[in-house]
């Protein structure tokens, strides 16, 4: 799943447009679209996107033995 797909699913679930998400992040809609096109976000940006949508972004690893980091 791409970053764009994840954000589109999350904004759709919340009923928030990309323009509104950009506003909540303090970004222009053009910057958000550029970032969605490249798929390049820092962990901190994922956390901010989650907060802007009233969610918690989780980034980590899950190993075959069930260990999560």
Roles of regions detected by a PLM:
Residues 38-51:
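Short, basic-rich loop-to-helix N-cap that marks the start of a DNA-contacting helix
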Residues 13, 24, 52:
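Residues within the alpha-helical elements of helix-turn-helix
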Residues 1-16, 20, 60:
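A short, Lys/Arg-rich alpha-helix, primarily the initiator
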Residues 54-69:
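Short C-terminal boundary/hinge segments that cap the last helix of small helical domains
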Residues 26-41:
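Recognition helix of helix-turn-helix/homeodomain-like DNA-binding domains
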């Amino acid at each position: 799943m791409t970053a764009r797909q994840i954000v589109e699913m999350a904004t759709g679930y919340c009923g928030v447009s990309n323009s509104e998400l950009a506003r909540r992040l303090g970004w222009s809609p053009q910057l958000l679209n550029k970032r969605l096109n490249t798929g390049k976000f820092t962990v901190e940006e994922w956390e901010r996107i989650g907060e802007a949508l009233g969610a918690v972004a989780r980034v980590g690893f899950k190993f075959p033995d069930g260990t999560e980091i």
